[in-house]
Amino acid sequence: MASIPATVAAVAQANMVAPFTGLKANAAFPVTKKVNDFSTLPSNGGRVQCMKVWPPLGKKKYXTLSYLPNLTEAQLAKEVDYLLRNKWVPCLEFELEHGFVYRENARSPGYYDGRYWTMWKLPMFGCTDSVQVMKELQECKKEYPQAWIRIIGFDNVRQVQCISFIASKPDXF
């Protein structure tokens, strides 16, 4: 049973809004029919050189960029420059036994892979130059020549890790 005030309110609302009459004709949206002409697309002249990626068998994947060949010192410095430009705090970590995904401390699937890496010194708060990070990397490599070493960039405002990549691997990996 509907009450009288509800009926009156419904009638008043219906009078305030015009009824929907459907979509208007396409005259308001002019459309030109284009012919698919691929002759004007940019081209590199057929000189494509693709980078060879990591072989799918016999090599373990580590983390970001691990499918690429080892990064040179200059390439590592560019990555560090990138994280510094983004105002992230660089930090080095190393692992002596398991540089690849190894579920020892957590068995659940997902982002967290169960590894704990040892931090090399403290995060480099106030670091403004990739040369400083590269010197620390060389120091860590000298101390632990058979370790996996990664460089991490932390955002200290959001308190999250934003970048992580392998900077050094043991021989034979």
From Swiss-Prot:
One CC-aspect GO term: chloroplast
Keyword annotations from UniProtKB, A to Z: Calvin cycle, Carbon dioxide fixation, Chloroplast, Photorespiration, Photosynthesis, Plastid, Transit peptide
Annotated localization: Plastid, Chloroplast
An example molecular function term from Gene Ontology annotations: ribulose-bisphosphate carboxylase activity
Transit peptide feature, positions: 1-50
KW Plastid (keyword) present: yes
CDD domains per the UniProt record, alphabetical: RuBisCO_small
Major location (coarse): plastid
GO biological process: photorespiration; reductive pentose-phosphate cycle
SMART domains noted in UniProt: RuBisCO_small
Keyword Signal belongs to the record: no
Stored Pfam families: RbcS, RuBisCO_small
Its job: RuBisCO catalyzes two reactions: the carboxylation of D-ribulose 1,5-bisphosphate, the primary event in carbon dioxide fixation, as well as the oxidative fragmentation of the pentose substrate. Both reactions occur simultaneously and in competition at the same active site. Although the small subunit is not catalytic it is essential for maximal activity.
Other remarks in the entry: The basic functional RuBisCO is composed of a large chain homodimer in a 'head-to-tail' conformation. In form I RuBisCO this homodimer is arranged in a barrel-like tetramer with the small subunits forming a tetrameric 'cap' on each end of the 'barrel'.
Family of the protein in this entry: Belongs to the RuBisCO small chain family.
Assembly, per entry: Heterohexadecamer of 8 large and 8 small subunits.
Record-given protein name: Ribulose bisphosphate carboxylase small subunit, chloroplastic 6
